[in-house]
Amino acid sequence: MRCSKTTRISILSATWLLTTAAASMAEDSLLKAAEGSSLKAAEGSLLQAAEGSLLQAAEGSSLKATEGSLPKAAEGSSSLVLKGVWLNENNYTLSRYQRVGGKGIHGGVDVRLGAPVRARGQPASNDWSLALLNLGLPANAARFTLDTRDALALDLSYREITQQLNNSGLSPFQGVEQLVLSDNWIAGSHSDSFDQGLINQPLNRALVRRKLQLEVSQRINAVWQMTSQIELEKQTGHRLNGMAIYTNAANPHGVLLPKPVDQQTHHFALSSLYNDGTTAASLGYHFTGFNNHFRALTWQNPFLSGLGTALDYPAGVGSYVSAPDYSTHQWLASAGHQLTNRIRLTLDGSVASTRQDENLIPLEEIDGRQADIDQPVDRLDGALRINTLRLAVLTQPLRRLAVNFRYGFKQRKNSFQRYAWPSIWGARNDTSDTDLRINNRPLDLEQDTYRLDANWRLKNRTRIQLRYDYLRTARNFAAVSLTREDRYALTVYLPGSVRLKHRLSLTMNDLAGSTYEWSRGFFQDFSTDLINQTPANQRWTNHPLLRQYSLSNQEKSGIQWLTTYQPDSAWTLQLKGETDWVNFDKSELGLTDVRDAHFNFSASYRHSSRLNSWGWVDYRASQRRQTGRDFLGGINKPANVSLPPYPQGSDPSRNYQTDQDNTATVVGAGLDWQFNQRLAVSSSYSWLHGREIFDIQANGARDLNGENLPNIETQLHSLDSQLRFKSSERLSLTLQHQYLRFADNNWQWQNVSLDAMRQVLGSGQRNPNDVIHQLTFSLQYRF
């Protein structure tokens, strides 16, 4: 089982730091660097779009409210809040980031304490505050601050948040890190042959994140200050992962599994700051340690895949290796000096080193016995080093004109050695061990960035901002080794009046790459023996056209418009529009065109000092066009081998095109009414409608039929109403009602049973169809 058995663990563990953990921790990964600015344009895969980012956008404030900066109790104020919450049903919409819990009645407490204030309004010499929020509820948090005003400042905080995704699916597997099937499991070649009564284990998809943070700042004198920060973060729970089962791409099968999550991240930072008004400097040290308590997931193959007794049920065991432990040390320094009244110079740099902190997982045979194959090393002793340098010259040659020059350098240096790692792709004697060895690729990168920008204020209230960036990126072990990008930006603040303001922004990016060496990956990954056995016209790991230019050649243009109008003291109107277009001008296959648009209109009206109302309309549209090419003949007729009348990879009649159009419309309105000094009400309503269209078209071949995928419709109604009553100066009551009506018809889950896809063991997850009522009663006492 390729990529799904224990024999692959050590290979994945050995290369993980090179491709994932260290890259994402120590700076942008090579893939991100190669993609350049196309990352934003191409980020939405079809699967991600089909899963629906609309829900995430609709509930956005839920996460923001929970994860946002913790409130600090006002100086001299203290309060106690008692909460009672009733929820009518369990759901995955309101509870995606749990703030309350499941169905039923829940209780919570908020406590806020603050330093006393002197009679004349002067605070005490030591200011402190304590906030304990949502005690007894899933999304609880706490914060303590202390400020001596003379020297010491301390900020200690803790927060906990639970993410509960749709867990209505079922699984036949038992266990946590070693998933096994029941003793009476009857395997089959397809999922519809399984006994559905044995698929009865809940599929847990909850994830809990806890974060503890301490920040201390000590002022030594008028110009020197020391700051330190410690942060501990722990994540536990499960994520849903799809795992593949196959050997040499033959007879593939798949399963959906709950992947355990149990990891800790430690951050420590120490810095020294100097600032005398003319010269500023700082020295700093950062440390990050990642500790993963879950190393590998194994599971029984539930299928009879025809891959041999060693790979099929019950002996076949698949495996997945998680991120290894690693540590990062970073040293930083910066300095700035005011050379003259019109010129300031700044310089900063950093050096970072990331190392893997654990030995590799032993390589094992597919039948579970210890493999008689030696690994080149038991531990990766190299390091990934990231060096940065930035220089800025800030000038103001004229009273209304500022001109700045900036230069940045980034170096990603990988000191890991290259090794040939043994790999067993299938049953014995499929190919010799020497032939199937895979080389790791220590990725290096160097990037130079130049920026020139100007800010010009004219006498007629017009302000013009111009910016030009040039990026040059060189990398090894990549099909495109060199990219150059020019970025232009123009922003104009148009003349208007005190009540009417306009802003126009234009951007254009041009990314160009060197020649796409499509065979480079084949020669760098595989052994010389395998290369010599492979015909010269078949030495490639990817189709020559599929990703040839899509990530390294593109033209992007964008426009933004903002108008704010206040016809009088009561009205405020705002109109905003923006659109982006990315043209992958040299792509024949793959992603070829991306268009995004966003328009927003909002209005607010202040009827009186006690009554405010507002409304808004928001529209978003995204269009992505991808082109694919179908191949005949399978493994014996590679796409780049000439077969009459065309080479398969060059026959345009076998093209097919996928157009993905996503739209989301939101309409909302709200009211805030203070009846009198004691009674106030507020209410807001929003309606969201989203549609995702997948249009598939064939290009002429008789045996290719373009059949569109079903549209995905998403609807959300949200109503939030509050009644606030102030009984006295110290006592107040709040009654809140939240109503949510959410439903979608996502075809990827709707009516997709456990055995709907014959070669994939699914989960039978249900689509959300929620009607949610939540009542919250709060009693606040100030003292």
Predicted segments — roles?
Residues 2-11:
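Bacterial N-terminal signal peptides that target proteins for export
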